[in-house]
Amino acid sequence: MIEITIGNAMNGIERANPDTLSGVFSSFDDANWTDKTKLSDERLKDLIEHMSKLKVGNNNYSADVMGDSYEFLIKKFADLSKKNAGEFYTPRSIVKLMVELLDPKAGDTVYDPACGTGGMLIEAIRYIHDDKMTYGKMYGQEKNLATSAIARMNLFLHGGRDFKITQGDTLRQPNYLENDKLKRFDCVLANPPFSLKDWGAVAFESDKYGRNMWGCPTDKMGADYAWLQHMIMSMNARTGRCAVVLPQGVLFRSGKEGEIRKQLVESDKLECIIALSGGIFYSTGVSACILFLNNAKTHNHIGRVCMIDASNIYTPQRAQNIMSDTDVEEIFNLYTDYQDVVEKSKVVTLEEIRNKEYSLAINNYVEKKKQEVTPPEEVRKQYFEALQATREAEAYMKELLIEGGYVNE
């Protein structure tokens, strides 16, 4: 059978390249290769014959072309299967904005604890624009075995040659350790699964890596603040920056999450919050936000947080809202300007947040345009003037109809 032959060939390629491709093809269940309802022998044959006509060797195409082609296919799948896409694909405009906030430099270490197909790490490599300075600097962990294999292939096809993608449950078993402590990174970024249930709260409550330093949400609450605390503990104490996508509920939910949020505010690591438009993410109608944290705030940012309302900064399309490059630039400029802009941004002090009982809901802070309210006496005057004008118009029309003989006087 042709599919078995292909599977054997893929496994042979994997065995011949253990340093870069180990586990990439064998991570897929045999059913993926042998399901004739999805890919018949005839279609496989046609596909092989078509690809055989193309020159796809390293000498024919650059890594960017091959990598972008692979990424295109990943996005195409995400477009066609929105319900399942959220677990592995983050819209590239969101990724671009997060990487711009982090501003990774050549030589910085970059870590994604929920890396999906590796898109955030690839964008970081593009941003640094120096492949040699990213060697050994890119790290990712992904729970899903097949998705972690896709991530490794994705980075490989984008020209990555020295990166580390591991498979495992980050919250239960973080893979990156140094001297039995969490490894620290210059840049930490992720779009973890929103409000993940049954994520391992019991073990996290006595976490040996200290990731529960501000508290432990329950399994029913979801893992949002567990992810955030893991990422904060993974930041380099001196240079660490962190950008994470979370549901907007983390900004105002009470109970244990409210207590953790209070500690987050008082730590003064939080530099910017961006409330995003709805309908941008696959597979969820939940409104999301980006939290940007910095262990090395500039002097004029200390004790302050920039709140950005980007809920109206998007480009509508038929199937899904998107953020264009222009939209991303507008949001990023609101952060770099770090100023008050009516209906768009507000720089608040920690004291102002304390006065709001540590709620970080954007609409509590960003100023809205003042609507002009017409005094009641003016409304009354305008009403009677309009009523009088209507009566005069009716009288004039009646007069014309009488003159024309259309109605009797």
Language model features: what each stretch is:
Residues 1-106, 164-175, 275-279, 300-311, ...:
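Non-catalytic, mostly N-terminal accessory regions of nucleic-acid modification and defense proteins
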Residues 179-409:
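A conserved structural/catalytic subdomain of Rossmann-like adenosyl-cofactor enzymes
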Residues 84-190, 195-206, 210-213, 226, ...:
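Conserved S-adenosyl-L-methionine
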Residues 40-41, 66, 70, 123, ...:
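Short, flexible segments with low predicted structural confidence
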Residues 78-81, 133-135, 315-316:
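Short small-residue beta-strand/loop micro-motif enriched in glycine and branched aliphatics
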Residues 37-40, 58-62, 87, 140, ...:
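Alpha-helix initiation/capping motif
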